[in-house]
């Protein structure tokens, strides 16, 4: 018989990998997985750095916007106060002109005071400051009136009898409530 007919013991079976080949293939797979994981890590670290930078920029933009808004509010308040003060200057001028007339009669003083009061009220209205002056017999409004006293009367309870001091609204907000006397419950 020839030597080729007997299978050799050192020769591996065809189709089945040897343990060394399995180990090498497993090591190659692990190396590929490690390489892929390292590449993903580098990508994720770059993305993290990019997101952290974007966050810091957005935070800085927000702080700058807040600072600009605060500055704008401060400027608006300052301008509103300046505008209001400027609108009062003609009233001051009228008072000073009236006081400069040393020989004015009581009637002239009264006319000057009436004109100056009218000028002041016009200025207040132009600046959205409106009187609260409830009519006698009107219903008591706790949002705009402050009851100072109660008096017995024939009218319905909580009805305004008299106004002791006018109140004022500024842009639909109570600056000072009107001080009123109201009817007591029967």
From Swiss-Prot:
Q: Does the keyword RNA-binding apply?
A: no
| GO BP terms | protein folding
* UniProt cross-references to InterPro entries, sorted A to Z: GrpE, GrpE_coiled_coil, GrpE_head
Q: Which SUPFAM superfamilies match?
A: Coiled-coil domain of nucleotide exchange factor GrpE (SSF58014), Head domain of nucleotide exchange factor GrpE (SSF51064)
Where is it chiefly localized?
cytoplasm
Kindly give the Pfam families that the UniProt entry links to this protein. Answer: GrpE (PF01025)
A cellular component term, taken from the record's GO annotations: cytosol
Q: For the region Disordered, what residue ranges are annotated? A: 1-22
Q: Which domain of life is it from?
A: Bacteria
Q: Where does this protein reside within or beyond the cell?
A: Cytoplasm
Keywords in alphabetical order, please. Chaperone, Cytoplasm, Stress response
- GO MF assignments: adenyl-nucleotide exchange factor activity; protein homodimerization activity; protein-folding chaperone binding; unfolded protein binding
Q: Where is the composition biased (Polar residues)?
A: 1-13
The record describes its quaternary structure and partners as: Homodimer.
Described by its record, this protein's role is as follows:
Participates actively in the response to hyperosmotic and heat shock by preventing the aggregation of stress-denatured proteins, in association with DnaK and GrpE. It is the nucleotide exchange factor for DnaK and may function as a thermosensor. Unfolded proteins bind initially to DnaJ; upon interaction with the DnaJ-bound protein, DnaK hydrolyzes its bound ATP, resulting in the formation of a stable complex. GrpE releases ADP from DnaK; ATP binding to DnaK triggers the release of the substrate protein, thus completing the reaction cycle.
Concerning its family, UniProt says:
Belongs to the GrpE family.
Question: What name goes with this protein?
Answer: Protein GrpE
Q: Which organism is it from?
A: Polaromonas sp. (strain JS666 / ATCC BAA-500)
Q: Which gene encodes it?
A: grpE
